[in-house]
Every structure is written in structure tokens, then in C-alpha cells.
Amino acid sequence: MLFTKTIKRMTIAAAIVATIPALAAAAGGNPDLYADSSKVVPVTELKFYQDKEGLTVANGWGDPASGAHSNYIKMPGGTASGVHTHTYSYYGVVIAGVVANELPGSKQDHPLPAGSYWYQKGGEQHVTKCISQTECIFFVTSKGAFDYLPAR
């Protein structure tokens, strides 16, 4: 009896787990995020472009205009964004250069060399800076669409 109940529970659990990918696809799940096979993209194949906010961007996975995504972003050395927010929170990982991501009015920058990361809460004003003299490249990932909302 106990064995039969255990088998039934395992069968139900397996059916639920097997259904999750289909539900994600039906809900508009991201095919790159849950691809059927692995994907390899050398840095030489990244296609950088200027987005509508003027950022130099290459798409990682997903669609930054509509939902979950990752992007590579380039900033020239010694430059800073204006004070701005994003609707959705994100994580940033520094690939090249030295970045600082600070709240407005911060008294000093907290240098983030290559390999460092930061978390930016959605709706919180901040300034992103490339504080090295050389170009900065960082990888950003978010569960929501990308936007850049200048502070007023």
C-alpha cells in the first residue's frame, strides 16, 4: 500500500516536472534561455550596435525590448551615465576595464575591476561609470525588459 502511494506520488511529480518546459513555451518562454541544446558564442561573433538610448550593446540571450535578457554593454574609458533608473533590477558583471555603479551623491567610487559584479535594484537612482582610462565592458542580466529612465 505504502509502495503504491509512493509510486503514484513519484509519477505525479514526474508529470509536473515534464510539463514545466511546455508551460514556459506556451507562456512565451525564451527559447535561448531554455534551448534544447547548448550554445557557444565566441566574443568575435558578438554584434555590437547603438541602441535607442545611445548605449553600445550586444545581445546575449533573450529580447531586451520585451522581457528576460542579458546584454553586453560597452562604455568608453572615463565616462559616466547620467543619473537614471531601470524598471527591473539587474546584475552586472565586469568583463573589461574598471566600473563603478553608485548612488547619486556618493562621496567616492567603489572600483569594480574585471571579474567583479554588482546588483542594481529596479527603480533606484544610480550612476554607472567607466572609471578606467580604457574601455569598459560589462554583462548585464535581468528578468525584465531593459529601459533607461533619466532622473528628472
Question: PLM features: what roles do these ranges have?
Answer:
Residues 2-12:
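Bacterial N-terminal signal peptides that target proteins for export
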Residues 11-22:
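Bacterial N-terminal signal peptides
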Residues 25-69, 152:
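A short, N-terminal "cap"/entry segment at the start of jelly-roll beta-barrel domains
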Residues 69-86, 121-123:
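Conserved short histidine dyad/triad with adjacent acidic residue
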Residues 76-78, 86-105:
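Glycine- and acidic-residue-biased ligand/ion/polar-headgroup-sensing regions
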Residues 81-83, 101-102, 120, 125-131:
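Short beta-strand His + acidic residue motifs that chelate non-heme Fe in jelly-roll/DSBH
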Residues 106-123:
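Short acidic-glycine-tyrosine-enriched beta hairpin
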Residues 122-146:
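Ligand-binding loop in jelly-roll beta-barrel domains
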